A protein has these predicted regions:
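Compact beta-sheet-dominated globular domain cores
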Residues: 79-144
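An acidic, glycine-rich, mixed-charge low-complexity segment common to nucleic-acid enzymes
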Residues: 1-77
Length: 145
């Protein structure tokens, strides 16, 4: 039988660990997932990414449920992955989700970014997301009366 984590604690993001981002992949290969105004300006996109990560880490220190576990079939067994909300335009709502996994006991690595639709699909494979930012309607435009 497959084993996806060693302990239940592996499913909770450890805020005491350092987070290192794969900027070249996130901004090089996935810039098309960013809001349009940031796609044309990689310098602003990186600044927005750094700011959004800092915001998410502050929120996670107050509420561990902000970072949601995900399951990705291609990830190595025994590796927990997480989805961290990224509010890139500072409007209080997530625009993308950062995929994070442990590189070692003290470091997490931010691998890539997913659209909210992609993130919701991956998160619900573990359990129903218990989060205020990752909802079934994530990413859908608001209805206009």
């Amino acid at each position: 039988m497959a084993q996806y984590v060693r302990t239940a604690g592996d499913l909770v993001y450890d805020c005491s660990c350092e987070l290192k981002l794969a900027y070249s992949h996130i901004l090089g290969d996935n810039i098309d997932r960013f809001p349009l105004d940031l796609q044309a300006n990689p310098v602003r996109a990186r600044q927005a990414l750094d700011s959004a990560v800092n915001w998410a880490l502050r929120k996670t220190r107050r509420n561990y449920k902000v970072v949601v576990p995900q399951w990705y079939p291609a990830a190595p067994e025994d590796t927990a992955q997480f989805l961290m909300p990224l509010d890139l335009d500072s409007d209080g709502r997530a625009d993308l989700a950062l995929v994070v996994s442990k590189a070692n006991e003290r470091i997490y690595r931010g691998h890539t970014v997913l659209t909210l639709e992609m993130a919701y699909s991956n998160a619900r494979l573990v359990a129903r997301p218990d989060s205020e930012w990752l909802l079934p309607s994530a990413g859908e435009p608001d209805e206009v009366d």
